[in-house]
C-alpha cells in the first residue's frame, strides 16, 4: 500500500494461480518480488521462474537460499529467521520481512524525494475526498 501511495503500480498476489498468470504478463520494465522464508515454497519459486522467463527483474526475500535459485533470481535478499517462531508465541517470523520492506521503501522514497512525496500527498488527498 505504501509503495502504491508513492506512485508505483503495485500488485500483491497470494493465490498461486494468479501469481503464475501475473508472472507471465510482466516484462523487462517490471520488478517481481517473491517472499519465502523457507526458500522452498514451490508456488513462489515457480512464479519467480516464470517472471524471469518474461524478462522481469526478479528478487527473492528468504532466510534460506536453496541451490539453483540464483539461476532465475537477479537478487536474493536474506532475512533473519529464528527457528520455531512460526507458532506465533513470540515474535512473528515475518517481522524481518516487514523490516526489509521498510528499508526498501525508505531507500526508494529517498531518491527523487520531492516528486514521490507529491505523489504520496496526491494519493492521500484522493482517499480523503468525498
PLM feature segments, named:
Residues 1-99, 103-113:
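Glycine-rich phosphate-binding loops that contact phosphosugars or nucleotide phosphates
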